[in-house]
């Protein structure tokens, strides 16, 4: 029976699970858009929303909490100085999960995890076309 068993375990030990989520969080903050499975995306979404809220507070205690989740101080700086200020007028829902189908090898449901205000970087060819016009 699975009574009172909640949360996502991903078939891993607690340390492995923590390392997985820290890595995904770091990638999300570094690239602002990642592709992963739906279950992992939903788990990281909760943590990312919480971290952006800490980033909006901006005090020392919030920075230290963010350091416990992120492996690199540069990522904490990016979170507090670049990402959190973009969401100053929003009260939650900073990250979205977009389902993209299934992986070919094992049919795992895939998703794109990105910040809500993510803008695709323009390609060089697009920039040249705009200059020509």
From Swiss-Prot:
It comes from Thermodesulfovibrio yellowstonii (strain ATCC 51303 / DSM 11347 / YP87). Keywords: Ribonucleoprotein, Ribosomal protein. SUPFAM superfamilies: Prokaryotic ribosomal protein L17. One of its GO terms (biological process) is translation. The keyword Kinase does not apply. GO terms for cellular component: cytosolic large ribosomal subunit. Belongs to the bacterial ribosomal protein bL17 family. Part of the 50S ribosomal subunit. Contacts protein L32. GO terms for molecular function: structural constituent of ribosome. This is Large ribosomal subunit protein bL17. The keyword Ribosomal protein applies. Transmembrane segments: none annotated. It comes from the Bacteria.
């Amino acid at each position: 029976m699975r009574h009172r068993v909640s949360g996502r375990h991903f078939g891993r030990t607690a340390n492995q699970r923590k390392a997985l989520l820290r890595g995904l969080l770091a990638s999300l903050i570094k690239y602002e858009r990642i592709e992963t499975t739906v279950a992992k995306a939903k788990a990281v979404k909760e943590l990312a929303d919480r971290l952006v809220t800490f980033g909006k507070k901006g005090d020392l205690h919030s920075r230290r909490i963010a350091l416990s989740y992120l492996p690199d101080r540069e990522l904490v700086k990016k979170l507090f100085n670049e990402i959190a200020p973009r969401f100053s007028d929003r009260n939650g829902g900073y990250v979205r999960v977009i389902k993209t189908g299934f992986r070919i090898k094992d049919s795992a449901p895939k998703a794109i995890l990105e910040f809500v205000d993510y803008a695709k970087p323009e390609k060089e060819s697009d920039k040249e076309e705009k200059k020509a016009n």
